[in-house]
Amino acid sequence: MGRMHAPGKGISQSALPYRRSVPTWLKLGPDDVKEQIYKLAKKGLTPSQIGVILRDSHGVAQTRHVAGNKILRILKAKGLAPTIPEDLYFLIKKAVAIRKHLERNRKDKDSKFRLILVESRIHRLARYYKTRKVLPPVWKYESATASALVA
């Protein structure tokens, strides 16, 4: 899928493994994988970071095939899921960083423009998550309280 505010076409993507069965050489069972997920989530890692660690350190290509569920669903069942979705969280974090930069460099017009683009992406994504009932309907992004969300 193409980028929203950039000229890139975004053709590159990772390929999913063809076989959906669990590899025979994998020593971890479904319960072991879930325990690893819980342990890493309690350390404060995001679901994508957990997936990368499971892939690189433990050889779990797709958690869904081994454990029977996606990482975020496993975390939701245990009550360890993040309050706001990961992609929205990182957009808010980026907006806070740009605002902090603009406090020091008031004349930076390009950063001011990029902040507008990032915040429009935040509003669009928040609207999507409200319709999917991931966020509460009264949730609103405000730049004044944004730094408290990502701290």
From Swiss-Prot:
Entry-linked HAMAP family: Ribosomal_uS15_A
Record-linked Pfam families: Ribosomal_S13_N, Ribosomal_S15
The record's annotation in InterPro entries points to: Ribosomal_uS15, Ribosomal_uS15_arc_euk, Ribosomal_uS15_N, uS15_NS1_RNA-bd_sf
Task: Tell me which GO cellular component terms the UniProt record holds.
Answer: cytosolic small ribosomal subunit; nucleolus
UniProtKB keywords: Ribonucleoprotein, Ribosomal protein
**Mind telling me what this protein is named?**
Small ribosomal subunit protein uS15
Which Gene3D superfamilies does the annotation name?
A: 4.10.860.130, S15/NS1, RNA-binding
- What domain of life does the native source organism fall in? Eukaryota
